[in-house]
């Protein structure tokens, strides 16, 4: 039996790695896109093109080969072009039946911080904030998120008390004709 493959787009946190590897038996691949965001250029014009191309390069996996993707709040740090590029890559590499977990802030932020999320257990996620050179650049409304992940279905969506929308998307399995 093959272990499910999950990609973590955030900075790998030990407890999350242990949770997916030891508790769930998943192969976890950490693709820390926050490092790319931190080292991105300061020139807004070329930033969009650069980030979009980084998204394509970093997620150069075989189409339909990944069981799950942990996005955390990475989309809050991306402009529209880079976010669309990343979402398209995620949809491309996701297996039918595969899932995407993402967090979207429901309010605008101006302070510069990065949030690292750690899975504590099956019921709890812990967050820790750190200073960073980059602030969240975009607030995603529900309609924008639906468009971003066009082709995936929404499995679950919760608005948390801390004004974060937690969403689980699923790639539909192909229907078989009878």
PLM segments and residue spans:
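Residues at alpha-helix caps and immediate loop-helix transition turns in enzyme cores, especially N-
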Residues: 16, 82-83
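Hydrophobic adenine-recognition pocket in adenosine-nucleotide-binding enzymes
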Residues: 74
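A short glycine-rich, Lys/Arg-flanked "PGG" loop and its adjoining helix->strand segment in the class I
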Residues: 84-99
